[in-house]
């Protein structure tokens, strides 16, 4: 059966741990100058409807490290414009071995998976951002060795990033708290789906960020206004003004707490320069972990036998 990664629900907790262990192994090898050509002769298509820095570069560089190749497909290919979605998708699958898709709507990625005979990777949609969440928990794992029982606090919106992060935390037995203004909660259908799959998950939402971070192992934030929400920017700035990750908030947290941000950041809004560039920040390392996490994910989808033979969890 063809494997896709549309959401983290497509992975088991054991598979997620295997991906994390593989990412750690590949990262260690790269630091030693080793680039095992595990995906030699494989080609990845990057099909993007939205602009990107980290996602595009991390996938392209990661595929290069693994001995494979990649090609970028932008608006000029006419996805959904010049021919039927099923024709476009099935033809694309004749030329490449996998597709990483960054789409405006999650339905577009589901459509790709419905018609395609190669693995589809959701590299960002309006619903969720699974690749980011894998990099996030990889960063937590690097800091603490074991993530079970740790506490992740997301200060911000119940958006695509926090949806995937909440699910990743449930899969790995990490407590998850969303600190947000009223009206910006995680949607109940998503929470219900997580709790139906992982009934022992510890998940909370609060409008008090100071209280939320007092037992935090990681404090995570994101922009207050995402792409496509520009018309809401004034209302959002007003709603989130007391949810900035700043020095005052960090003082309420344990000294060992790490600071995360998926980037790009609007410095001075959701996070201050002092915190983002401070000693507790792992933001840049977290961004770099996108590549290592995605390399491991591509191996999981394209050559799972390599992980079975070489990685122990």
Swiss-Prot record:
GO terms for biological process: arginine biosynthetic process via ornithine; citrulline biosynthetic process; L-arginine biosynthetic process. Its EC number is 2.1.3.3. Carbamoyl phosphate binds at residues 102, 129-132, 262-263, 290. Gene3D superfamilies: Aspartate/ornithine carbamoyltransferase. Keywords: Amino-acid biosynthesis, Arginine biosynthesis, Cytoplasm, Transferase. It catalyses: carbamoyl phosphate + L-ornithine = L-citrulline + phosphate + H(+). The keyword Cytoplasm applies. It comes from the Bacteria. Belongs to the aspartate/ornithine carbamoyltransferase superfamily. OTCase family. This is Ornithine carbamoyltransferase.
């Amino acid at each position: 059966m063809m494997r896709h990664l549309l959401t983290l629900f497509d992975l088991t907790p054991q598979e997620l741990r295997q991906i994390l262990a593989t990412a750690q192994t590949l990262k260690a090898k790269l630091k030693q100058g080793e680039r095992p050509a595990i995906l030699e002769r494989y080609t990845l298509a990057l099909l993007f409807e939205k602009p990107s820095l980290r996602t595009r570069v991390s996938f392209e560089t990661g595929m290069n490290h693994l001995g494979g190749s990649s090609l970028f497909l932008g608006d000029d290919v006419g996805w959904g414009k010049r021919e039927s979605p099923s024709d476009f998708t099935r033809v694309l699958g004749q030329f490449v071995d996998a597709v990483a898709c960054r789409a405006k709507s999650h339905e577009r990625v589901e459509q790709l998976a419905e018609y395609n005979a190669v693995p589809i990777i959701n590299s960002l949609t309006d619903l969720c951002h699974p690749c980011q969440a894998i990099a996030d928990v990889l960063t937590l794992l690097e800091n603490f060795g074991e993530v079970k029982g740790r506490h992740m606090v997301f200060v911000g919106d119940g958006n695509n990033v926090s949806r995937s992060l909440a699910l990743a935390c449930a899969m790995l037995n990490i407590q998850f708290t969303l600190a947000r203004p009223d009206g910006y909660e995680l949607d109940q259908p998503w929470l219900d789906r997580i709790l139906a799959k992982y009934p022992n998950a510890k998940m909370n939402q609060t409008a008090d960020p100071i209280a939320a971070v007092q037992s935090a192992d990681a404090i995570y934030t994101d922009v207050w206004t995402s792409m496509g929400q520009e018309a809401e920017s004034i209302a959002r700035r007003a709603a989130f003004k007391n949810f900035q990750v700043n020095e005052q908030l960090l003082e309420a947290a344990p000294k060992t707490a790490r600071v995360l941000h998926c980037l790009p950041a609007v410095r001075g809004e959701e996070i201050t320069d002092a915190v983002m560039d401070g000693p507790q920040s792992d933001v840049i390392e977290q961004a770099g972990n996108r590549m290592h996490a995605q390399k491991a994910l591509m191996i999981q989808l394209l050559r799972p036998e390599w992980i079975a033979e070489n990685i122990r969890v």
